Amino acid sequence: MASSAAEGKLTVITGPSGVGKGSLVKQLLELHPEIWLSISATTREARQGEIEGDHYFFLNRDRFAELVQAGGCLEWAEFAGNRYGTPRQPVEQQLSLGRPVLLEIELEGARQVRRSFPEAFQIFLAPPSFEELERRIRGRATDPEEAIQRRLARAREELMAQQEFDAVVINDNLQVAVIELESLMGLSC
């Protein structure tokens, strides 16, 4: 395991849909297996091939509500009739073991983490331009026009929140953005 100045540090990465969060996090985890990527809890049913504790922690609605009520989530939200959240206990356990912990979450979740875990280092991932973000979203060719317009409207709002974050990384080039993330997270190369 590589030594890292990020040991025991919680880092939050957020940014609008289509900015490349997933690609950057995947690359970062391949380069730095010492990073622990937080596993979300959800009330939705497990999909075929999903493993409890690997992909998600699958909870019924009552158990999820108990977890939230007890302060056991760093952040949570409801989406499409299901609840999703970041359980506090596994994050704190990994931090106590000295591992750098990474949360890849949406803007509202990042705001909740800012309140519940203020020492977390928060990074906003931004596109080089709004036009490039739109090109990426349309390039996926998976959504109808109405969904694309919703994503773009939400992205405009999210981009206005950049100043709330400890750092902003512009994802114009994947390799350069990964190097910037490594530096911000204090990861040895």
Swiss-Prot record:
* Organism from which the protein derives: Prochlorococcus marinus (strain MIT 9313)
Q: Which CDD domains has this protein been placed in? A: GMPK
Keyword set for this entry? ATP-binding, Cytoplasm, Kinase, Nucleotide-binding, Transferase
Q: Which residues bind ATP?
A: 15-22
Known SMART domains for this protein? GuKc
Q: Under what name is this protein listed?
A: Guanylate kinase
**What gene name does this entry carry?**
gmk
- Subcellular location per the Swiss-Prot or TrEMBL entry: Cytoplasm
What is stated as this protein's family in its record? Belongs to the guanylate kinase family.
